């Protein structure tokens, strides 16, 4: 049975019912805006994170609802798929009232497209007209006030860069890390001399965020990163694209293939046009390059792309050696050299209908085998799917970030794998409280001052208190020290069974 998340169904319904609108003159699209491109030659010689352009903006949601905070956008020098390949992109800084100048949360919003018009930075602009197109980053931006309410400065990079290279993780990882450098370099933010950074990304945002975590040590180890949060994680590009084919969001198969090839075009040339696509496939590529994710999903809802209609010979994308090579290079955990060295919180629904749980779990296990510090939380309820898992984990994410900024221990530097079988949505009180907080967040964007003294989660997210008070994993019984995959810390049947299985295998020498 195929599932489509409720939020996605609603988004599709809105997209079909409301005509797409365009910016009316005062805010040009990125492809028409000189700000998105370096003004002079020589930018390639600047250090990564160097500011090339800057501007103050009026931030807004859906193009019309103003955010009452300070907001800037900067164009900065970064790197492409390889660290020695100069590139550039834009990031957006959001500064709440009474901001903590030593705490920055970098959020990689899902873009999931091959069209620069879908960039998160454009979605932040007040255009003066209702903007329904490019809904993917816009719905997540409504959740940013959960972080702004804490007094944290938010940094939101266009991690797909000028190529709009969706699914190219290393590419996005460089851009995320360099956005942190840009934040440190941007004087109007008035950051402390060594500010703390946390990276966060869910779904399509997990890819650049996870790779930023992986590349931090080798590419930008001067950054004071204190933690990473990622969920619904797309850690293996081809695995994800294969699993999506024929499903409601199958247009991502084409978008992902395009993104991977664009990031490495100097190595693979025009592989897709020359060897892969049929005429129908070329039409699909053109659609992807001129539409945002929900438009392409509507156009190709449920299509099977790895078929003779779209691909020559009906071959699987993984049958091309170039595709396999690039996908392996962009698979988290594949190379032990790129193992994150800062605390990580990962969470994933076992029955995620969009991004398969197994790839994320495999990455967590491989990272742990190479010395990472990870908590991997699995939700085993069949009623939790891709988007709802994110929404219901927001309090966990906020608490995790608080703990990281406050320097609290994270499982003794080891790994912890837990299973949560209870669905918080089954408890009406939890559902009501959580979504009340989210609705308050939305209301705060419609006119209230955004900062640590506003109404968001004021009663529910009190300092030092875990906000998940119903059916939560029992944090006080989580073990410390060296904990291997499968050894859970809660009292659910799944966790006990996994721990017993692991101990039995360890006794017989299957684990070392």
From Swiss-Prot:
pH effect summary: Optimum pH is 7.0-8.0.
Disulfide bonds: 118-292
Record field: catalytic activity: a triacylglycerol + H2O = a diacylglycerol + a fatty acid + H(+); a monoacylglycerol + H2O = glycerol + a fatty acid + H(+); a diacylglycerol + H2O = a monoacylglycerol + a fatty acid + H(+)
Comp. bias regions, Basic and acidic residues: 488-497
GO CC aspect terms: extracellular region
Assigned EC number: 3.1.1.-, 3.1.1.3
Cellular compartments annotated: Secreted
GO biological-process terms attached to the record: lipid catabolic process
Pfam families documented for this protein: LIP
Predominant location: secreted
UniProt KW keywords: Disulfide bond, Glycoprotein, Hydrolase, Lipid degradation, Lipid metabolism, Secreted, Signal, Virulence
Top-level lineage group: Eukaryota
Record's signal peptide: 1-17
Expression triggers: Most frequently expressed lipase gene in the scalp of patients with dandruff. Expression is regulated by environmental pH, and is expressed more highly under alkaline than under acidic pH. The effect of temperature on expression is marginal.
Glycan-modified residues: 316, 361, 453
Root EC class: hydrolase
Record field: compositional bias (Basic residues): 498-512
Catalytic residues as annotated in Swiss-Prot or TrEMBL: 203 (nucleophile), 352, 386
GO molecular function, one term: triacylglycerol lipase activity
Disordered, as annotated region: 480-512
Protein purpose: Secreted lipase that hydrolyzes acylglycerol lipids such as triacylglycerols and consequently releases free fatty acid. Can hydrolyze 4-nitrophenyl palmitate to release 4-nitrophenol and palmitoic acid. Due to an absence of fatty acid synthase genes in Malassezia species, secretory lipases are essential for the yeast to generate free fatty acids from degradation of sebum and assimilate them as lipid sources for growth. Plays an essential role at the pathogen-host interface during disease progression.
Family: Belongs to the AB hydrolase superfamily. Lipase family. Class Lip subfamily.
Protein name as annotated: Secreted triacylglycerol lipase LIP5
Organism: Malassezia restricta (Seborrheic dermatitis infection agent)
Upper classification of the organism: Eukaryota, Fungi, Dikarya, Basidiomycota, Ustilaginomycotina
Gene of this entry: LIP5
